[in-house]
Amino acid sequence: MILRDYQSRSVADLFAWWTKHQDNADIPLLVLPTGSGKSVICAEIVRQMWEQWPEYRPRTVVLVPSKELAEQNAGKLQALLPDNIHVGYVSASLGKKQHHADVIVATIGSIHKSAHLLGDIKVVIIDEAHLVSPKGSDSGMYRTFLDKLGQICQFRTVGMTATPFRGNQVWLTDGDEPLFTGIASNVTMRELLDQKFLAPLVPPNARIETRIDASQVGISNGDYKVGELSAVVDSYLQQVAIEATRIASERMKWIAFTPSVDNAESLADKLCKLGI
């Protein structure tokens, strides 16, 4: 697999960061827009470690929030790594607990209490790093896992995200005892658009009439509470689908952002019933 220039640069930037910052508590971010191929970059990080330092057996844990991302990351890892490097899962949703694999792709909900079963780990890669609690005093799943693993082995950590700041505009590297201490590499949306790796969004010419009232939705850690927001959005989806069909029926491809998977599936179903 031939990497794009920015993908190779991101990997090189990470290794340069780790070389400069020797303390395991120095944890960088790779800022990578949606569509940049985070799973490819993740796989290349692991591939280079096994190629350069096989004598250290650089076993790696890739933390993801969902089984879908677990399967996506594992697929890229299996495509890039030699057959003798075993890629396994720890995911209740997939029915697999392969704690002794060379590279473990794990859903955080399934592994956060299982650090003691992993043995010697050299690297932890956190996908969707903005999901990590912003408070050092908060014993969330990610911090619990890292703390427990740190009691049995020494390892380096990196986070990957498309959004290096939270809904309250506070950067992931700022605030009360942030987990992440700096940005090792930053790929911009403009760079991907200019190189035509991403297509620009085309907004509708017609006025959008639907306005979702989220004034009663609660706020947590500077962002909307997803469950409450999803419930509110659900009541608007039929109206949204009808309006979208009216103003964008001539477009070949659409993209819709919803607060939850349930919202997305419901909207897709409504669009299908409208002939989209």
Where are these regions (language model features)?
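Conserved pre-motif I regulatory segment
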Residues: 1-31
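Walker A/P-loop
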Residues: 23-45, 255-257
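Conserved Walker A/P-loop ATP-binding site and its immediately adjacent core
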Residues: 39-41, 56-79, 260-262
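Inter-Walker segment of RecA-like/P-loop motor cores
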Residues: 78-116
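Conserved RecA-like ASCE ATPase "motif II neighborhood" in helicase/translocase motors
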Residues: 103-128, 132-145
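Post-DEXD/H (motif II) to motif III coupling segment of the RecA-like Helicase ATP-binding lobe
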Residues: 131-203
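Conserved interdomain linker/interface between the two RecA-like ATPase lobes of SF2 helicase motors
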Residues: 181-258
